[in-house]
Amino acid sequence: MVIDRTAVLLLQMGGPDSIEAVEPFLRNLFSDRDIIRIGPAFLQPLIARLIARRRSKRVAEQYRQIGGGSPLRKLTEQQAAELEKVLGEGYRCFVAMRYWKPDTSQALEAVVQAGITRIVALSLYPHYSRATSGSSFNELERVRARSATPFQVTCVRQFHDHPLYITSLCDRIGQALSGYADPGDVHLLFTAHGLPQSFIDSGDPYLDQIRATVALVMERFGGINHHLAFQSRAGPVKWLEPSTEKKIRELAGQGVKKLLMVPVSFVSDHIETLHEIDMQYRHEALELGIEDFRRVESLNSSPLFIDCLAELVRGGDRTEET
């Protein structure tokens, strides 16, 4: 019997898997006009090349410190494998990275080779922004338009308030809090990837969705002190405030001694968790007098999180046909 299968396309940012890949990865990132507009469109690839060359040495050193490359591809492929097990034989899962390999065109070619034309494109960014999910879906549409295959695509654009996503976050936080003698002494610092304020001013829903996630999580942790901040700022423009560095300084100044970091916009470990939080922010916090600095484990292939993805794929309420 021939099984009518659906391809699940997991859309993720991607990351350089070697030191040599850092500069071309950065070049791809800074060439994307959905995330940053540098001069006229025809000049952006050249400017992106110059920026990537200038930044690559510093960024490469950060990747060297976490093992020589990003684990994001491996972790996303593990998520794809676990999701395929949960979904069963009617589904095949593929990975499409926005700025590295396998890129969207490679992923769609693999779908074609598998003989599948129906796709559920699932963004692994829980919170929608035109700079993240929006960019990935735009790239998918460009690649699809060039293909001779008549794909039928359903897009899952966000899941910031999905009950299983909230439960999976709460599970990780609960595990971390159980390691303290008195959780009431702990301050939770939810840290999300930053975004230029201009995106929010133009109607991007990212900030509202981040706040909604935090509010839903905190319904289950009444009495625990919590805060929200934004990391990974780049460039001279105004970004969402407060920055994570600023909030850590503020909390240290208030005498906070136990700080538990909760990465809220990342579903897998990568440079922002393994270096920025685990190394950079840890060092700054300890220098400022915070005595106990910890981070909640990332979702990665948490069974609860994989169940969330499976429910979304099977036709949750965040889908639309394109």
Swiss-Prot record:
User: What are the GO cellular component annotations?
Assistant: cytoplasm
GO molecular function annotation: ferrochelatase activity; metal ion binding
Can you say where in the cell this protein is located?
A: Cytoplasm
Single GO biological process annotation from the record: heme biosynthetic process
Report the pathway entry.
Porphyrin-containing compound metabolism; protoheme biosynthesis; protoheme from protoporphyrin-IX: step 1/1
Q: What is this enzyme's EC? A: 4.98.1.1
The protein's matches in PROSITE patterns, at most eight in alphabetical order, are given as: FERROCHELATASE
InterPro entries in UniProt: Ferrochelatase, Ferrochelatase_AS, Ferrochelatase_C, Ferrochelatase_N
Catalysis performed (reactions): heme b + 2 H(+) = protoporphyrin IX + Fe(2+)
Please give the coiled-coil regions recorded for this protein.
none
Give the binding site residues for Fe cation: 193, 272
Top-level EC class: lyase
Stated role: Catalyzes the ferrous insertion into protoporphyrin IX.
Q: Which family does it belong to?
A: Belongs to the ferrochelatase family.
Name-wise, this protein is Ferrochelatase
Q: Which organism is it from?
A: Pelobacter propionicus (strain DSM 2379 / NBRC 103807 / OttBd1)
